[in-house]
């Protein structure tokens, strides 16, 4: 028997203005990578996003999906909050790793509230951003400790879309050694 899974994601600053002409949001304001600047998320919009993740998981469950995966890696919104490269906030969503992880933890809690404790949740994370000043393996080990007991599966890769040289680690190709991200998963699993 195969299991059906759905990936839940918000692009944050990676939203493409060619396909989306609404506001582009990130943890902090800044210049957009595709020519459209982005704004810092306010509390009301953060709450809205958290609720929509929960609603999407609930719809997936009602539709017969067996597990949801929250994408908190590769430079998407939840990862942007985690990354010191993107998150320059000074409120409860910035500064310490625990604060930068807060939105992801709120998403998980919202999904648990709407789908129950028996509905499996996977979190996909970058074990390291592979870029100076970015998330390190040590940071992500601490993030995994926050996830422990709250999710059912942690999926570890590496890299971040905003830094193209790391893309081959997100989707390993034939030029990298087989299992190139396994050392990250092993360290996080400990």
Question: Model-derived features: where do they sit?
Answer:
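Flavin-dependent oxidoreductase catalytic cores
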Residues: 1-190
């Amino acid at each position: 028997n195969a299991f059906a899974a759905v990936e839940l994601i918000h692009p944050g600053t990676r939203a493409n203005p060619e396909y989306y002409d609404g506001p582009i949001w990130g943890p902090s304001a800044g210049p957009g990578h595709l020519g459209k600047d982005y704004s810092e998320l306010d509390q009301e919009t953060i709450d809205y996003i958290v609720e929509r993740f929960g609603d999407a998981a609930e719809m997936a469950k009602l539709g017969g999906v067996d597990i949801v995966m929250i994408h908190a890696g590769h430079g998407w919104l939840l990862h942007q909050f985690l990354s010191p490269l993107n998150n320059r906030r000074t409120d409860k969503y910035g500064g310490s790793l625990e604060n930068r992880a807060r939105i992801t933890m709120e998403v998980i809690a919202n999904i648990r509230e709407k789908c129950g404790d028996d509905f499996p949740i996977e979190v996909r994370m970058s074990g390291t951003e592979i870029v100076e000043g970015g998330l390190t393996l040590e940071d992500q080990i601490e993030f995994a400790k926050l996830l422990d007991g709250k999710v059912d599966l942690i999926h570890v890769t590496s890299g971040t879309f905003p830094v193209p040289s790391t893309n081959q680690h997100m989707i390993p190709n034939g030029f990298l050694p087989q299992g190139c991200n396994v050392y990250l998963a092993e360290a996080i699993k400990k």
